[in-house]
Amino acid sequence: MASTSRLDALPRVTCPNHPDAILVEDYRAGDMICPECGLVVGDRVIDVGSEWRTFSNDKATKDPSRVGDSQNPLLSDGDLSTMIGKGTGAASFDEFGNSKYQNRRTMSSSDRAMMNAFKEITTMADRINLPRNIVDRTNNLFKQVYEQKSLKGRANDAIASACLYIACRQEGVPRTFKEICAVSRISKKEIGRCFKLILKALETSVDLITTGDFMSRFCSNLCLPKQVQMAATHIARKAVELDLVPGRSPISVAAAAIYMASQASAEKRTQKEIGDIAGVADVTIRQSYRLIYPRAPDLFPTDFKFDTPVDKLPQL
């Protein structure tokens, strides 16, 4: 017997004996089979993917046409509809040159708004190379907010941007507000407002961000070697443990730690270079750096190879 569980409102069929096994789908028979024990845990399975057919009169010609889009469970009717493609023969047009067969697709205004938002979310995610699971979670968040009508008066693009920010936090791959701003047309201030309103409306939360959440990506974008990244991570963690940076954002602390580590190595980076990657101003980096500089000897890992001694580091 198949057991089902809900993940983000989407059903998942699992084997009762091997719940972690990835089921094998037999499309010909319409069965879902457990590869571990061979149990058929689902039958008469319907393929909800998009369907392609070939309508060419010439069998040697390949012109597959989509005759059905994939099902979208986030829309009210699953977005199951029939689309008529453009004709190519003379019989497809009337005497005025207009297509005889045209789409008469009915879609509610709410579904149309969600479809537009989903497209915008996918576009934003593609621009910063976010995986599909982030897009799916963002779409689910947007649907919940939209149906609750709790953010009436806010632009859908702003809500979508805030949902993307929340989804990244919840999936453990946080992005900064400025990174989301860069791929959307929404200001940081508006995304921040929607972010707080969404958390309140959905009664959900996100994990607190730490300096470690950004360190690897920032250092990679700055083309810094592994030794500098490890040193910057150590510096930031020790600075927090020693309570040297109270009230400072993890992003500014991470940027200051990277600046200190790079200045002590042969791979030096300027405040502007780091600020451009981290999305913080030079003055913000300097303020955090000044807080940790007096304890610099205590912040570096013991095995760090200095190119510039601690006492020669910039004092700013």
UniProtKB/Swiss-Prot annotation:
Which amino acids does the record list as binding DNA?
53, 61, 152, 154, 189, 196, 248, 272, 281, 284, 286, 290
Documented effect of changing residue 196 to L = Reduces interaction with VP16
- Describe the reaction catalysed, as an equation: L-lysyl-[protein] + acetyl-CoA = N(6)-acetyl-L-lysyl-[protein] + CoA + H(+)
Which residues hold Zn(2+)? Answer: 15, 18, 34, 37
Query: What does the UniProt entry list as the effect of changing residue 37 to S?
Result: Does not inhibit interaction with TBP. Inhibits the recruitment of RNA polymerase II into the initiation complex
Q: What is its EC number?
A: 2.3.1.48
The record lists the effect of residue 200 to L as: Reduces interaction with VP16
Which cellular component terms (GO) are annotated to the entry? cell division site; chromosome; germinal vesicle; kinetochore; nuclear body; nucleoplasm; nucleus; protein-DNA complex
Expression tissues:
Expressed in the inner cell mass forming the embryoblast. Not detected in cells from the outer thin layer trophoblast (at protein level).
Q: Which domain of life is it from?
A: Eukaryota
Q: Where are the zinc fingers (TFIIB-type)?
A: 11-42
Give the UniProt subcellular location, in the record's own words.
Nucleus; Chromosome
Q: Residues annotated as region Necessary for TATA box-bound TBP complex formation?
A: 244-316
Q: How is it modified after translation?
A: Acetylated. Autoacetylated; autoacetylation at Lys-238 stimulates transcription activation.
| GO biological process, any | RNA polymerase II core complex assembly
Mutation effect (residue 66 to A/E/K): Defects in transcription start site selection. Supports a level of transcription equivalent to wild-type
Any GO MF annotation of the entry = acetyltransferase activity
Residue(s) carrying Phosphoserine: 70, 76, 92
Question: What does changing residue 286 to A do?
Answer: Reduces DNA-binding
Q: Does the keyword Phosphoprotein apply?
A: yes
* Self-association and partners: Found in a ternary complex with TATA box-bound TBP. Part of a TFIID-containing RNA polymerase II pre-initiation complex (PIC) that is composed of TBP and at least GTF2A1, GTF2A2, GTF2E1, GTF2E2, GTF2F1, GTF2H2, GTF2H3, GTF2H4, GTF2H5, GTF2B, TCEA1, ERCC2, ERCC3, TAF1, TAF2, TAF3, TAF4, TAF5, TAF6, TAF7, TAF8, TAF9, TAF10, TAF11, TAF12 and TAF13. Associates with TFIID-TFIIA (DA complex) to form TFIID-TFIIA-TFIIB (DAB complex), which is then recognized by RNA polymerase II (Pol II). Found in a RNA polymerase II initiation complex. (Microbial infection) Interacts with HIV-1 Vpr.
Homology family = Belongs to the TFIIB family.
Name of this protein: Transcription initiation factor IIB
Gene, per the UniProt record: GTF2B
